[in-house]
From Swiss-Prot:
Function in brief: Histone-like DNA-binding protein which is capable of wrapping DNA to stabilize it, and thus to prevent its denaturation under extreme environmental conditions.
Gene: hup
A GO MF label: DNA binding
Protein name: DNA-binding protein HU
Keyword Chaperone tagged: no
Entry keywords, A to Z: DNA condensation, DNA-binding
One BP term from GO: chromosome condensation
Other noteworthy facts: The heterogeneity suggests that there are probably two distinct DNA-binding proteins, as in E.coli.
Superkingdom as given in the UniProt entry: Bacteria
Protein family: Belongs to the bacterial histone-like protein family.
Length: 32
């Protein structure tokens, strides 16, 4: 795995995590 692939993998994971966080916050807003 070269550096570019590693960066891509980290960015992809960060994007998924942010989407999950946004969805979680949205769900809290709906419940509240």
């Amino acid at each position: 795995m070269n550096k570019g692939e590693l960066v891509d993998a980290v960015m992809a994971k960060a994007t998924v995590t942010k989407k999950q966080a946004d969805a979680f916050i949205l769900a809290l807003d709906i419940v509240a």
